[in-house]
């Protein structure tokens, strides 16, 4: 099985779309104290970039890869609800799973020097360890989770960073950046 570990912000939800969820939430909230999880799934998230979705769909069609959501958006919905949102935004495949949260599940001892990149790389590694059927995979994120991008001055019991990683460093371009699609395809071929 081929898998794309997909972040959203800075990959398919680009900086020009950030904040669009707040406009949607104003329209549907019945009371100010209403939890985000009580809102319709469409109102919980910012819109995806249409051109970024086109690139993602091309990759999915070419490779047959499945999607596992590594984005922190996963805390606001179920896999089923995220699949509904993907369909409403034009993504041709629903996610098959979310990566877990290694910190909340006490799989590791959290340290204050950790950042999102280190934690997310551990979550992806943990998911892959539980799914030996994965033959090809790539993580796509706007956080630099490459082994050279994550460095700590202290020693930890975990190996940080990912080998199969594509960094979308330009948050206003994301997956549309020149050369990004080819890098992703190289990991999935």
Name each model feature, range by range.
Residues 1-64:
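Active-site neighborhood of HAD-like aspartate-dependent phosphohydrolases
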Residues 3, 66, 136-138:
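Structural motif
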Residues 6, 70-76, 140-142:
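Short His-Asn-centered micro-motif
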Residues 12-13, 75-77, 145-147:
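Short, active-site-adjacent cap segments at secondary-structure transitions
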Residues 42-46, 72, 114:
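Short, charged/polar micro-motifs that form catalytic or ligand-binding hotspots
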Residues 63-83:
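Substrate-recognition element of Asp-dependent hydrolases with the DxDx(T/V) motif
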Residues 80-189:
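C-terminal cap/substrate-recognition subdomain and adjoining C-terminal extension
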């Amino acid at each position: 099985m081929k898998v794309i570990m997909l972040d959203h912000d800075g990959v398919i939800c680009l900086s020009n779309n950030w904040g669009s969820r707040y406009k949607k939430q104003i329209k549907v909230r019945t009371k100010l104290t209403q939890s985000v999880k009580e809102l319709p799934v469409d109102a919980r998230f910012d819109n995806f970039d249409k051109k970024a979705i086109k690139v993602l769909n091309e990759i999915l069609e070419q490779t047959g890869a499945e999607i596992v959501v590594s984005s922190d958006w996963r805390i606001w919905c179920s896999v089923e609800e995220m699949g509904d949102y993907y369909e409403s935004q034009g993504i041709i495949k629903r996610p098959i799973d979310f990566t877990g949260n290694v910190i909340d599940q006490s799989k590791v001892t959290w340290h204050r020097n950790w950042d999102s990149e280190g934690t997310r790389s551990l979550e992806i590694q943990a998911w892959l360890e539980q799914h030996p059927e994965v033959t090809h995979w790539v993580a796509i994120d706007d956080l630099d989770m490459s082994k050279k991008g994550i460095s700590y001055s202290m020693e930890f019991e975990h190996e940080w960073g990912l080998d199969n990683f594509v960094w979308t460093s330009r948050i206003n371009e994301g997956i549309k950046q020149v050369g990004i699609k080819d890098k992703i395809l190289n990991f999935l071929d």
